[in-house]
């Protein structure tokens, strides 16, 4: 198992980043790839969790150990896999998540992608009281870019699709942001807040 990787960030896609270390390029699934935009071609430290399957060995990466801890707690819940946990981490509202779990706010938890009533109830059952204090912000707000607005919105929509949101939901998000000029990372953060409001 890996704890973290330190290497050069060489590539960003809608779903993952690539970090080169000792001549190898590691594909690392992250909650919001565009939050790493300012770190391209720079030395980065990414905290890791490895998932081993019959057909693949997958790496999931995080800005901080707090973010990784939230992810690990989420995947300990029956019915929540790594992709769903990553989508929850991407919302970057740890305080809201912890409050919803501790206060049995099933409706709030069901706003996350792929979380139905049964899984939300299981989250409360398994995780209530497990967060001693709300984890710090995960670092998705760090990156900034000056690329053109439409390209950035396209990248944001692609990243949201990778997190499990439906095209129908994202059509409304695209219409809402059409004509604005933000970074992909900013679009993702704003879109996630809108999606959580319903």
Curated annotation (Swiss-Prot):
Ranges for region Flexible linker: 143-147
Biological processes per GO annotation: DNA recombination; DNA repair
Region (Domain III): 148-198
GO function term, MF aspect, one: four-way junction DNA binding
InterPro entries, per the entry: DNA_helicase_Holl-junc_RuvA_I, Hlx-hairpin-Hlx_DNA-bd_motif, NA-bd_OB-fold, RuvA, RuvA_2-like, RuvA_C, RuvA_C_sf
Family matches, as Pfam families: HHH_5, RuvA_C, RuvA_N
Cellular compartments annotated: Cytoplasm
Recorded superkingdom: Bacteria
Sequence segments annotated as region (Domain I): 1-63
Keywords: Cytoplasm, DNA damage, DNA recombination, DNA repair, DNA-binding
Cellular component annotations (GO), alphabetically ordered: cytoplasm; Holliday junction helicase complex; Holliday junction resolvase complex
UniProt KW Chaperone keyword: no
Region named Domain II: 64-142
Major localisation: cytoplasm
Assembly notes: Homotetramer. Forms an RuvA(8)-RuvB(12)-Holliday junction (HJ) complex. HJ DNA is sandwiched between 2 RuvA tetramers; dsDNA enters through RuvA and exits via RuvB. An RuvB hexamer assembles on each DNA strand where it exits the tetramer. Each RuvB hexamer is contacted by two RuvA subunits (via domain III) on 2 adjacent RuvB subunits; this complex drives branch migration. In the full resolvosome a probable DNA-RuvA(4)-RuvB(12)-RuvC(2) complex forms which resolves the HJ.
Its job: The RuvA-RuvB-RuvC complex processes Holliday junction (HJ) DNA during genetic recombination and DNA repair, while the RuvA-RuvB complex plays an important role in the rescue of blocked DNA replication forks via replication fork reversal (RFR). RuvA specifically binds to HJ cruciform DNA, conferring on it an open structure. The RuvB hexamer acts as an ATP-dependent pump, pulling dsDNA into and through the RuvAB complex. HJ branch migration allows RuvC to scan DNA until it finds its consensus sequence, where it cleaves and resolves the cruciform DNA.
Family: Belongs to the RuvA family.
Domain-related comment: Has three domains with a flexible linker between the domains II and III and assumes an 'L' shape. Domain III is highly mobile and contacts RuvB.
Entry protein name: Holliday junction branch migration complex subunit RuvA
Gene (UniProt): ruvA
């Amino acid at each position: 198992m890996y704890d973290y990787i330190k290497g050069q960030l060489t590539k960003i896609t809608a779903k993952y980043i690539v970090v080169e270390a000792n001549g190898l390029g590691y594909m690392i699934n992250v909650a919001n790839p565009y939050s790493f935009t300012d770190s391209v071609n720079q030395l980065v430290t990414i905290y890791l969790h490895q998932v081993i399957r019959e057909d693949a060995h997958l790496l999931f990466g995080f800005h901080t150990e707090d973010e990784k801890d939230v992810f690990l707690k989420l995947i300990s819940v029956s019915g929540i896999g790594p992709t769903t946990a990553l989508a929850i981490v991407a919302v970057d509202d740890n305080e809201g998540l912890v409050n919803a779990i501790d206060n049995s706010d099933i409706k709030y938890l069901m706003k996350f992608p792929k979380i139905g009533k049964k899984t939300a109830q299981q989250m409360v059952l398994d995780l209530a009281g497990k967060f001693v204090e709300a984890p710090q912000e995960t670092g998705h707000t760090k990156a900034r870019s000056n690329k053109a607005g439409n390209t950035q919105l396209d990248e944001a929509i692609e990243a949201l699709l990778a997190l499990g949101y439906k095209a129908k939901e994202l059509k409304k998000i695209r219409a809402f942001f059409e004509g604005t000029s933000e970074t992909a990372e900013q679009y993702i953060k704003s879109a996630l807040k809108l999606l959580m409001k319903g």
